[in-house]
Amino acid sequence: MILIVAVIGIGGAAGVLRAADARTSDVERIDGLDAILADLPGDDAEYPAENYLLVGSDSREGIVAGSDDYAYVGDIDLVGGKRSDTIMILRQERNGGAALMSLPRDLWVEIAGTGESQRINSAYNDGPERLAATVSQSLGIPIHHYVEVDFLGFKDIVDRIGGVEVCTFKAARDVHSGLNLQPGCQKLNGDMALAYARSRYYEEWDDSDWTMDPRADLGRIERQQLFIREAVNGLLHDIESSPFSAGDTIQAVTESVRIDPRLDPIKAAQALRQAAQQGLHTYALPVYNDTVGDAAVLRLADDADSLLAYFRGEGPAPTQLETTTDPALVDASVDASGSG
């Protein structure tokens, strides 16, 4: 969804919109979510925003033994079950501005409709409906829309946009995800981008030995948000130089995502244009480490209240914000396209 915004909402040219409209009619819709999602706020609603639940699933569907993808993530027979590998909430305010909050997959919550507590990512075992209900009920945040992409979809999108540049001061690796980076800046293809985004056992070479990032999933969230910043900013530069070259990206996104039945990607992207012009802000949900039995989990920290209140529509945006898109570049792109 964020990449659709970058291509459509920021590009803005009429040709881009026509191409996008033709593509988005083919996007796969997930039946059954209407009963779970919050009512859409009208023009006079007290809640001045819409929240998108963005999900990266760890589904291996379509990956077969012996393929190039198998070496990185395995196939559906090797890795049983299906969980949400990445969970984010994108808040789009009616008067402009947007914020992205990442939820750690090990967050310990009550799973909606079960009366039992588990890690939040396990809710996806019972489908998108259960996950959306669990996120909404456990955090008190209304969810208005749902967007999902799986491993193969993520890889395809990155390859179609020509890769994403990531910089690291030291050599980095993750023997579990397949990540292997040299010091400096390099453009990641789909395979390596997936290894980077999935990395929970991230190590850096420190003079004479490999040092593990002790933050595990919290470190992964930080890297994912960095990746989103670079992907969006890279797309902005590409669109600025060639607004009509967005067709391949639009096709990749629409072929790779599943969305709720009532979401109109074009209208959503256009509504988010003003937000992109002001800059996208990213947050990590404050949590602390705990154990349940022998399992390591994360629980909500006390200082999460102000952030959750903002996403619930009950308080102002937290004061510590990080701008992830360059507003000046967005303005230049819109002006060049003749839209605004």
Each language-model region and where it sits:
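Extracytoplasmic/secreted envelope proteins and their assembly/folding machinery
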Residues: 84-86, 117, 128-136, 151-155, ...
